[in-house]
Amino acid sequence: MRDSRETFVNHAFVTGYPIKHSRSPLIHGYWLKQFGIAGSYRAHEVTPEAFPEFMGQLRDGGTGFCGGNVTIPHKEMAFELSDRPDELSAELGAANTLWLEDGRICATNTDGRGFVANLDERASGWDRISTAVILGAGGASRAVIQAVRDRGVKTIHVVNRTAARAQELADRFGRAVHAHPIAALSEVMAGAGLFVNTTSLGMDGEPAPAIDFSPLANGAVVTDIVYVPLKTPLLRQAEEQGYRIVDGLGMLLHQAAPGFEKWFGLRPVVDETLRQIIIKDMDVHA
């Protein structure tokens, strides 16, 4: 089987709408330079209306890309239009990583892998817990629920302002997942070992939630998939109450690694130098 690296000359992309804010080119550019690969990775903005045509051109070789990343709002359409989605993306109904094999578009979703890799790096032993609480039931929560469940967490409470959306996720991901309205947050936090914020609350310009983390288990981990600001008000509150915290930047970095390996043939490492490059860019564009 010929893979895409034999057909195309190591050119990959990230697409979304808008996309100019993406830090993915910085991440992959760092790895390309580190490995001395004469390839490229660039942002390629595509509107939702033009995305089906873009996927057709990718399949036919008209874009010159061997694959790439897909972000908001194209993840669901990327899954639907791919030829060979894997089980991860099929369960999520969304793909964020595409590559070509024999003229077919293959698809996966690395968000969940990025999430747990970040926890593994920054909160070793987190997966010895039995109960997790996930705040939010939007698209970002799906990969987190899937990844936490697949690491063996037996009880996952999904809390959302609209309980019906949380119930949709419970129905999708099986018996380990339980849906709750926001009024039940404190109750379901009791004894939990992991708290995950998958909402935009606490992002720059967004109001921060007032959450008392004291019902959590001693030594619990609180993490936020938001990484701007790096330490969100929610994480500050958890830290002040004595809990281990993990920011969301590592998820962004770790989810990028599997795609790079698909397109360029080498497995990159998420190191502190890369992390500091992204933090510096965040400071410059704050």
From Swiss-Prot:
UniProt pathway annotation: Metabolic intermediate biosynthesis; chorismate biosynthesis; chorismate from D-erythrose 4-phosphate and phosphoenolpyruvate: step 4/7
InterPro entries from the UniProt entry: Aminoacid_DH-like_N_sf (IPR046346), NAD(P)-bd_dom_sf (IPR036291), SDH_C (IPR041121), Shikimate_DH (IPR011342), Shikimate_DH-bd_N (IPR013708), Shikimate_DH_fam (IPR022893), Shikm_DH/Glu-tRNA_Rdtase (IPR006151)
GO biological process: amino acid biosynthetic process; aromatic amino acid family biosynthetic process; chorismate biosynthetic process; shikimate metabolic process
Signal sequence, start to end: none
Reactions it catalyzes: shikimate + NADP(+) = 3-dehydroshikimate + NADPH + H(+)
GO cellular component term of the entry, any: cytosol
UniProt keyword Amino-acid biosynthesis, yes or no: yes
Record keywords: Amino-acid biosynthesis, Aromatic amino acid biosynthesis, NADP, Oxidoreductase
EC number: 1.1.1.25
GO MF, any single term: NADP binding
Pfam families: SDH_C, Shikimate_DH, Shikimate_dh_N
Active site: K75 (proton acceptor)
Binding residues for shikimate: S22, R23, S24, T71, N96, D111, Y227
Record function comment: Involved in the biosynthesis of the chorismate, which leads to the biosynthesis of aromatic amino acids. Catalyzes the reversible NADPH linked reduction of 3-dehydroshikimate (DHSA) to yield shikimate (SA).
Quaternary structure (record): Homodimer.
Family, per entry: Belongs to the shikimate dehydrogenase family.
Name of this protein: Shikimate dehydrogenase (NADP(+))
